[in-house]
Amino acid sequence: MKIWAINERRRWCVQIGICVLLLWACSAEGFAQVTTVRGHVAVVGSMKASHAVLPGTVIWLTPVQGAASDPPLAAPSAPSNPRLVQKNKSFEPHILVVPAGSSVEFPNRDPFFHNVFSLFEGKRFDLGLYEAGTTRIVRFERPGISYIFCNIHPEMSAVVIALATPLYAIATADGQLSIANVPFGRYMLHIWSEGMVPESKEPEQREITISENSSSLGVIRVPAANRQ
């Protein structure tokens, strides 16, 4: 009877040990399936690098059609109350990235009228004249790049980029780019920068593979921006 009890105890210990090892292996594999993708923006063209001002740059990743990501990409999360504020005859922030389908507020915090509009393909709209202290709202239904202006103050400009992916990065002031928690797999890398001609509408893109040994985008070269 004692021998049976000892054997039974050993059997349970072995099974528990196997379960623990399997859970550890699954967890390790899960953590190994994502990485942080990094890159750096550099200006090309006639200007010398020492005098070039880095243009606003955004990159994003979309899975290549037919290439499943593991784990699957989560839906992009909307920032709380995304807004493009009009203040001191400028838009704040100058570049705003939102999930497609987001509603963006355009509050006027200047002591005079503004007339915000966009004529490019991302989202066409004209909010008309509206006074200080009031707000207009625009819904960006589909992915796209919208160039925003004011019909009264030509020096005002901004960009709203609506995306269908949570994997994006806005370049820092020194040109650094970083996207965390990128699942291993094949992606299209999309690159938008202020130095690109708006009329071209489409950002640059190329296919990349993200893996444990391939997570650096290297140097992303973009043209200098015209914005002062």
Task: Please tell me what each predicted stretch does.
Residues 11-12, 112:
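A generic signature of intrinsically disordered, low-complexity regions enriched in glycine/proline
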Residues 15-25:
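Bacterial N-terminal signal peptides
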Residues 1-11:
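N-terminal secretory signal peptides that target proteins for export/translocation
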Residues 8, 28-31:
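Compositionally biased non-globular segments, especially hydrophobic aliphatic-rich helices
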